[in-house]
């Protein structure tokens, strides 16, 4: 009953943020936080028809990274990799390969693989043959599990409430919001239902999708017909990080964003593309993982990112200093932080 009640509290908090019931814009932020002040001033200027900085509604495009920007990425690592571990080690309906099992067991001990093509191959292959609805249900079920490093938090609820507040604030001011994630698109869609964004505004990495009757035939040689069912093909096509984020923005949005939010150097190209050579006033924000009390932060990484913000002209967002809460006050971090060993995943 206690867990059920806590989940209700989280849902109510999110509902308050998304319905604008808070008394002031960005009320979960410290009022004088530099990032909040900069964003509110910017939005006021670009939405004022009498301002020299006015941006027409159709050009008000904001892009957000997911992991570490909108959503937890440090307990102990990315949602998509934890989903892979679950698939390989705990799903009775899946027969994992020896390679998948060895890698998943090693990662349970904190030895995470690098974010390279081999990692993406392993992840994609783990879901080969699943229908789109089966995979969607698999993700949603995993979202209902407890977040191990926190009390009173489910995996699917691990969103940064102050950042959800920004998404809603921008939408209320005529911005179109896109999520540009390195996580697979079909994983991100159910995970981000909380944002109430249409599927075409959720962009992520891509793997092949094929017909269940296609066999080994190339997509150019196969005609989809009545009775075919779409299944995951098990081959990664693109990892949506760094320059690939810029490419996907050009291909799928077709408009240069005016706001960009990220948290690591894998988002650097997206932020720099946003703020450089833009016909409109534009800003880029980078989150600093500097909170050790309410989140599994890393001060060394945070200090490095703060230096990068000065170098590239990004606005730093301090999770520790700028936010009144992260997941809601009912959520508490467990005492022992999960340690990331040498060679751990980092975007």
Model-predicted regions and their roles:
Residues 24-30, 37-40, 44, 59, ...:
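C-terminal cap/substrate-recognition subdomain and adjoining C-terminal extension
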Residues 75-78, 82-157, 161:
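A metal-dependent, Asp-based hydrolase signature
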């Amino acid at each position: 009953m206690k867990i059920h009640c806590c989940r209700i509290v989280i849902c109510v908090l999110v509902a308050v943020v998304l319905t604008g019931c808070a008394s002031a814009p960005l009320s979960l932020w410290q009022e004088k936080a530099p990032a909040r002040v900069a964003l509110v001033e910017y939005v006021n200027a670009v939405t004022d028809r009498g301002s020299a900085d006015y941006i027409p509604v159709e050009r008000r495009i904001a892009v957000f990274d997911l992991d570490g920007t909108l959503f937890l990425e440090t307990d102990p690592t990315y949602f998509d990799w934890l989903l892979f571990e679950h698939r390989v080690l705990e799903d009775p309906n899946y027969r994992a390969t020896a390679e998948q099992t060895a890698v998943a067991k090693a990662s349970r001990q904190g030895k995470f693989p690098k974010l390279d093509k081999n990692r993406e191959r392993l992840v994609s292959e783990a879901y080969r043959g699943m229908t789109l609805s089966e995979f969607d249900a698999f993700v949603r079920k995993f979202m209902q599990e407890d977040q191990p490093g926190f009390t009173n938090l489910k995996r699917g609820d691990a969103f940064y409430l102050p950042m959800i507040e920004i998404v809603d604030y921008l939408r209320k001011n005529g911005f179109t919001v896109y999520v540009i994630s390195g996580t697979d698109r079909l994983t991100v869609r159910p995970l981000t239902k909380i944002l109430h964004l249409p599927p075409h505004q959720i962009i992520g990495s891509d793997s092949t999708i094929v017909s269940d009757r296609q066999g080994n035939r190339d997509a150019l040689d196969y005609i989809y017909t009545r009775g075919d069912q779409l299944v995951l093909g098990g081959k990664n096509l693109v990892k949506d990080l760094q320059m690939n984020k810029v490419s996907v923005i050009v291909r799928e949005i077709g408009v240069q964003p005016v706001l960009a939010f990220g948290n690591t150097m894998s988002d650097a190209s997206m932020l720099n593309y946003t703020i450089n050579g833009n016909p409109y006033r534009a800003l880029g924000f980078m989150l600093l993982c500097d909170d050790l009390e309410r989140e599994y932060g890393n001060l060394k990484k945070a200090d490095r990112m703060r230096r990068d913000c000065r170098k590239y002209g990004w606005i730093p967002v301090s999770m520790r200093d700028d936010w009144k809460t992260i997941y809601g006050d009912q959520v508490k971090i467990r005492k022992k932080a999960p340690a990331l060993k040498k060679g751990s995943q980092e975007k």
